[in-house]
Structure formats: structure tokens, C-alpha cells
Amino acid sequence: MEVVTTPHQTQEMAHALKDASGDLILMLTSSATSDLNDTAPKAVRAAGGNIERFGMPVDPGNLLFLGALTGKPVIGFPGCVRSPALNGADWVLSRIACGVTLDDHSFAEMAIGGLLKEIPTRPQPRRRSEG
């Protein structure tokens, strides 16, 4: 396993991605990736890769993106990946690590049961309304 740290800038990240070794690339960014034109997805494209999926119907984990670069999967992790609680990133990583190909149908299937247990510091919407 190789860990590379770069500034949160498209070109620096793209350069590191081009040089990445291994069979899988995992990206953890300094801020939430909220759209396809954010730094991390742009860096994947600048390195010659593509983004196959942005977002997923699982919370926590909905800000994940999945791409590919030179035949390697690239997973852009949302902030919830730092939590020990089960989240959508766990579902994606476990499938990719096992060689399962994910497509739009695969992600749609994750929507069933996609609201995972919330962490205490971020109550579920129904708890907020009980106030």
C-alpha cells in the first residue's frame, strides 16, 4: 500500500493519480466532494480517467464517487469513511475489493435499506422534528 499526500489542487492530485501503483486507488479529500466539477473528480479526469458514478442513494455515504483510471477503480470517499459506523463507502469498497463490477443498477439496489444508522451527533430527520 502506498499513501500519497498532495495539496487539494487538481493538477497536483492528477499527477499523483498518474503515478499511483496498485490495483485500486482510494481518494480522501480535504473537503466534501459535492459535484462533478470539484477538485477530486476533475483530477481523475485530468489524469486521463473518467467518473462512472457520482453520488449514491445511501446515507451516510451519498457523496462518494466511483471512477476508473488505466483500468483501476478509483473511489472518492466521502467524510463518513472516517467513522467506524457502517456507511455507503463500506458497501462500495467491499464490492470493488471482491472484484464485483458496479453499475447504475447496483447503486439503485443499495437504495433499499440505504438510510443507515445515524451517528449521535447528527440525528435523523424524524428525530429533529420531535424536537
Annotate each language-model stretch with its function.
Residues 1-125:
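Short glycine/threonine-rich loop/turn motifs
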Residues 126-131:
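Acidic, Ser/Thr-rich low-complexity intrinsically disordered segments
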